[in-house]
Regions:
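Phosphate-binding loop of NTP-binding sites
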Residues: 9-15, 21-215, 222-235
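ATP-dependent carboxylate-amine ligase
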Residues: 21-44, 48, 53-55, 240, ...
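Residue-level signal for inorganic ion chemistry
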Residues: 82, 162, 193, 302, ...
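A generic structural signal for short, well-ordered alpha-helical segments in conserved domains
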Residues: 92-96, 307, 419, 466
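Buried hydrophobic packing segments
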Residues: 95, 99, 119-123, 303-313, ...
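Adenine nucleotide phosphate-binding catalytic loops in nucleotide-utilizing enzymes
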Residues: 215-355
């Protein structure tokens, strides 16, 4: 039975220099433990904000007080979740933008805390003391390994799974192991929104009716053979017999079928029917044209997943297309900078994720303009300490022999490991400079008239570079 409690709530206003104390009488609180968890989350988050920090700590505190708090809160009618090896943050950011522009109040973890503590923090910090989330849509990015914990107590109404790749060997092992972990997060009542072009992801739709599929038709850049150092689509994930492909878009993503068990690419409701990199236009379902502000196949899939999710919840396709055509990602994965007299583009590629790196280098080469490339590998991960660099051998660095790349700068603690990896390619060693001292190397680069620069690194090393450059206004077409 609901009880009434007299409560003194302390609310810290980080925009002022004082503390506001409000005395409230909270009615219809179903659980004092839930209330205390929400209060602790709100107060700790405000304290962290006052000192300029954001973290998942408020969620950790709340879960200590009330471990099942996520099963007690009242969620919005629409709960959209996104997981997968790549594209989570960008897809969530685009969905949030489109939905907000359409008039919906969206609660989402834009700080990127995507494990259960971060998910708990974003939910509780945006709900009443009675446990009602104050939004029309709850939009959650979830780490693929921890989704099973985040969704133990509630089911997303719509669950997008983008892709599954080799990623962070120390933490994730093999993608088939990650597949099993994600599988545990899927609830019967959730509508799945799946990438039909990924043979591993498409397995989640087996024997399920409530599935929406998205994918891409054959394009000019599609190939009849696997690209990259390895092919994780060589064998069927269902029966382990050899897989056949009609075409590949990249890595193991494409149109596939198994002659032994029948596992194949599913028909899609949301389809990229044309990608024109020259004009920078992607066409969905033969009708909706979207301007590509970042001309990468990764971005095409992120846009498609966003389009599918927003369309499913009732937003008009023309509205979605118009908004995506004018929105540039704010997540810090693509930045414009100036280093000395040289202008450049900063690109995030997750360390330990070979597919992400391959796509970034493919983007640089596709631009086909004279440039120099800076690759920084200093700290492999933000989450754990490791010197394990076998993943370097999964990346197709051989493509960097392209004539448009005039010089390569290898920086950071693992620069010599990368130099060894490059020695097994056809790259001219004369255009490679190795320097483990990042600040000193950047000072040297700043003093040279190199022209266009590209810098490729991960979040763990991002600030080591950005602290030495001047950020400039993002260009529409990078």
């Amino acid at each position: 039975m609901a009880q009434n409690y007299g409560v003194t709530a302390v609310v810290l206003d980080s925009t002022s220099n004082y503390v506001i104390i409000r005395f409230s009488f909270i009615k219809e609180i179903k659980s004092m433990r839930m209330f205390l968890a929400i209060l602790a989350c709100k107060v700790s988050k405000c304290l962290l904000k006052l000192i300029g920090r954001g973290s998942s700590l408020p969620g950790d505190i709340a879960l200590k007080i009330c471990p099942d708090v996520l099963s007690r809160v009242k969620l919005p009618e629409q709960v959209i979740a996104v997981t997968g090896s790549n594209g989570k943050t960008s897809t969530v950011e685009m969905i949030a933008q489109v939905m907000r522009k359409s008039g919906k109040k969206v609660i989402w973890n834009k700080e990127g805390s995507n494990q259960i503590a971060g998910v708990t923090a974003i939910i509780l910090s945006n709900c009443t003391f009675g446990g009602k989330v104050k939004g029309d849509v709850l939009l959650l990015e979830s780490d693929e390994r921890y989704a099973k914990y985040s969704f133990k107590f509630f089911a997303p109404t719509h669950y997008i799974i983008t892709n599954l790749y080799r990623d962070q060997l120390t933490r994730n092992g093999h993608p088939e192991w990650v597949y099993e972990s994600v599988k545990e997060s899927i609830r019967p009542e959730s509508q799945l929104i799946l990438n039909a072009d990924d043979p591993l992801v498409s397995r989640y739709g087996k024997d399920r009716d409530n599935v929406i599929w998205f994918g891409m038709d054959k394009q000019d850049f599609s190939t009849d053979h696997a690209t990259g150092v390895y092919n994780d689509g060589a064998f069927c994930p269902e029966c382990k017999h050899r897989m056949s492909y009609d075409y590949y878009h990249y890595a193991h993503i494409g149109s596939y079928h198994c002659d032994n068990c029948g596992h194949k690419k599913h028909d899609t409701q949301y389809t990229v029917t044309n990608v024109d990199y020259d004009s920078g236009i992607v066409t969905i379902n033969g009708k909706y044209k979207i301007k590509l502000l970042f001309k990468s196949v990764y971005n095409v899939y992120n846009i498609l997943a966003c389009f599918a999710a927003c369309s499913i919840v009732g937003i008009d396709g023309d509205v979605i297309a118009d908004e995506l055509s004018h929105y540039f990602l704010k997540s810090g994965r693509i930045l414009q900078f100036k280093l000395g007299m040289n202008k450049g583009t900063f690109l995030i590629a997750k360390h330990e994720n070979s597919v992400a790196s391959d796509r970034v280098y493919d983007y640089i080469i596709r631009k086909n303009q004279p440039c120099s490339v800076i690759i920084i590998i200093d700290s492999v991960s933000r989450r754990y300490s490791t010197g394990e660099t076998s993943w370097l051998w999964d990346i197709d660095y051989g493509v960097l022999k392209a004539d448009c790349i005039q010089h390569l700068y290898l920086l950071g603690r693992h620069a010599k490991d990368l130099e060894t990896r490059l020695s097994y390619t056809d790259i001219d060693i004369a255009k490679v400079t190795v320097n483990e001292d990042i600040p000193a190397a950047l000072d040297e680069i700043a003093a040279k008239p190199l022209g266009k620069l590209y810098t490729v690194t991960c979040f763990s090393d991002k600030e080591k570079f950005l602290s030495k450059v001047e950020l400039t206004q993002a260009e529409e077409d990078v």
